[in-house]
Amino acid sequence: YAQSSSKHLAEAGLEFELRQIPREELEAAIKDANQDSNVSGILVYYPVYGDKRDQDLQDMVDPTKDVEGLNVVYNGKLYGNDRFLDEDKTRKAILPCTPLAVVKVLDHIGVYDHDLPYGDHLRGKTIAVVNRSEVVGRPLAALLANDGAKVYSIDINDIQIFERDQAASINSHVISKTDFKVEDVIPLCDVVITGVPSAGYKMPTKLLKPGVVAVNFASVRNFEPEVKEVASIYVPSVGKVTVSMLQRNLLRLFNYQH
């Protein structure tokens, strides 16, 4: 991802500097980058610790330079389904690059229905997200649910449902725990999105609904080769779109700074 980011940012005329920092020096490095007027955006490659300390690092990044949108400020906006940073709605909140890339891919291939009202473009869609990391899977499930989908969020421990609370005064999602198994929910899904960072993991093709949209955002292929025989659309990677979203976030932050 770092190499791809560097290449594509350079092609767009944007400077990318990879700083390899020992873990024990990372906090100081983030603070230095926050104060450096020559730095327009900061991207930390996670996981660093693989626990809640990573969230502490995310919250250390200055929101005006947080190109991944993982700071508590942007998290609050995402999970509260509030797209703007200001009351006048002139500055949009930054969204995490990979979840945003998946959303853009789904929109491009026609999963989003723009004949429905704004905020309901995924109404009637059932989607599985096989990954619940704080960096990708959880925010992706929230984004999809906030757009009206019923989302089965699947990780190694359990399956949770993310969906809009139609009775609530705000238009954000609620989360319900379930006792479902993967084989219970995957056949119900119009879209199956995988992001398991293991070459040994494969989504069983036999579980997939005929005509399903299958999207993989992991660095390895999570679907079996036979997926092409079942899926109406199969997207094996969103890496290039993710880098495009990184560029988009960076340019948006640069405009906010100036």
Regions found by a protein language model. Give the residues of each.
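Glycine-rich phosphate/diphosphate-binding loop of Rossmann-like nucleotide-binding domains
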Residues: 1-7, 84-203, 213, 228-229
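Long, contiguous binding/interaction regions
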Residues: 12
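Phosphate/diphosphate ligand-binding glycine-rich loop within oxidoreductases
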Residues: 15-96, 224-227
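Short hydrophobic/charged patches on amphipathic alpha-helices used for structural packing
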Residues: 27-31, 181-183, 205
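A short, aliphatic-rich alpha-helical micro-motif
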Residues: 36, 185-187, 207-208
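Redox-cofactor binding/interface segments in oxidoreductases and associated redox assembly factors
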Residues: 41-44, 194, 215-216, 236
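Short glycine-/small-residue-rich Rossmann-like dinucleotide-binding loops
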Residues: 47, 195-198, 218-219
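Rossmann-fold NAD(P)-binding glycine/threonine-rich loop
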Residues: 55-71, 75-85, 200, 210-258
